[in-house]
Amino acid sequence: MFSVVLGAAVAFFVTVTLGSSFIRFLQTRKFGQYVREEGPETHLIKAGTPTMGGVLMLMGLVAGLAVVARPNPATFSVLLIVAATAGVGLYDDWQKVSKRHSEGLSARYKFLLLSLVVVLADVMALRYVGVTQNVIVPGFSNNLVLGPGVVGVGLFSVLMLFVIVGTTNAVNLTDGLDGLAAGAGGIALLTYTAIAFLERQYDLAIICGAMVGAIIGFLWYNSHPAEIFMGDTGSLAIGGVLSAAAILTKTEMLLPVIGGLFVIVALSVMIQVVVFKLTRRRVFKMAPIHHHFEMLGWAENKVVVRFWIVQSAFSALGFLMYYFFLYSSV
C-alpha cells in the first residue's frame, strides 16, 4: 500500500511541477487546439489552448513508477499497451497540429493502428503474463471458457479488440469539456487500483495509482478554464491503462460498469448517428451527450461535476459487484 501511495504522490508532484514549463513549451511551438466550428459556440474561445497534455501525464506516470515499480512481465506489458495507445494518440494530435485542423487521423486508420495494439496486447497477455482465455461473468459460478487452441485465442483476441478499442475511443469521446475525461478516468482508475490490490496484483495497483496521481496533477491545469488539453495522447493513454487493468484482473465484463460514464457518452454518439441517418432527426441537441446539456444551458463546470458524480456512482457499483460476486467467492 505504501508503494501505491508513494508512486501516486510522486506522479502528482512531478506533473504539477513540470506543468507550467510544459505549457510554455507548447505555446512557444504553437501546439494549440483547433476547435470544431460545429461545436458549441462557447468553445470557440478555447481555440489555441495547448494540447498534447497527455505527454505531461505520462511524464508524471513514468516518474512515479521509476521510484516504486518493479521490473517484471506484468509491468512491462501494461506500459507497452499504454505507450502504444498513447503513441497512436500522439500521432493523431500531431496530425491536427501540423495540418492546423481539428480533424486528425481518419476513424478507419485509427482503428487499424489500435488493432495493432491489440495484437501486441494479445501476445503479452497470453505468452508473457499468463492471462487465461476464460471470461469471468459476475453472478455465475463457472467461468466462460472461450475455447481450446486457436479458437480460444481467436475469441480472446476479439474480446481484447472490443475492450481496448472500445475503451480508448469512449474515453476519447468523453474528452470534450475541461476536466471531464481526466476526472472520470481518475475515478475509474482509482477503482481499479483497489481491485488490483485486492487481487494481490501489486505491480498493477502501483501503475493504476501512479496514473491517478498523474491525472490529479494534470487536473491542476486542466480544470476550467483549462490551460492545457490532454489531447488524444492523454485520452488514449487513460483508455489503455483501463483496458490493461480490466484484462489483467479478469474483470472485462465489469469494465462497462466501472467506466459507466464512458459507455453513456459513446452510446449517445452512436444513437445520434443511427437515428439521424434513419429519420433525419436528432435525439440530442448535440452529441456527445455532455454537449447536449451545455446546449440546455448548463454551465460547463456544472456538467463536469455532475458527470463526475455519475461516474463515481458507476465505479462504486462496479466495485461492489466485484467485491460480492468475484472477490468474496474466491
From Swiss-Prot:
GO terms for molecular function: metal ion binding; phospho-N-acetylmuramoyl-pentapeptide-transferase activity; UDP-N-acetylmuramoyl-L-alanyl-D-glutamyl-meso-2,6-diaminopimelyl-D-alanyl-D-alanine:undecaprenyl-phosphate transferase activity. The keyword 4Fe-4S does not apply. Pathway: Cell wall biogenesis; peptidoglycan biosynthesis. Its cofactor is Mg(2+). It is an enzyme of class 2 (transferase). Keywords: Cell cycle, Cell division, Cell membrane, Cell shape, Cell wall biogenesis/degradation, Magnesium, Membrane, Metal-binding, Peptidoglycan synthesis, Transferase, Transmembrane, Transmembrane helix. The chain crosses the membrane at residues 3-23, 49-69, 71-91, 111-131, 145-165, 179-199, 204-224, 228-248, 256-276, 307-327. PANTHER family: PHOSPHO-N-ACETYLMURAMOYL-PENTAPEPTIDE-TRANSFERASE (PTHR22926), PHOSPHO-N-ACETYLMURAMOYL-PENTAPEPTIDE-TRANSFERASE HOMOLOG (PTHR22926:SF5). Catalyzes the initial step of the lipid cycle reactions in the biosynthesis of the cell wall peptidoglycan: transfers peptidoglycan precursor phospho-MurNAc-pentapeptide from UDP-MurNAc-pentapeptide onto the lipid carrier undecaprenyl phosphate, yielding undecaprenyl-pyrophosphoryl-MurNAc-pentapeptide, known as lipid I. This is Phospho-N-acetylmuramoyl-pentapeptide-transferase. It comes from Rubrobacter xylanophilus (strain DSM 9941 / JCM 11954 / NBRC 16129 / PRD-1).
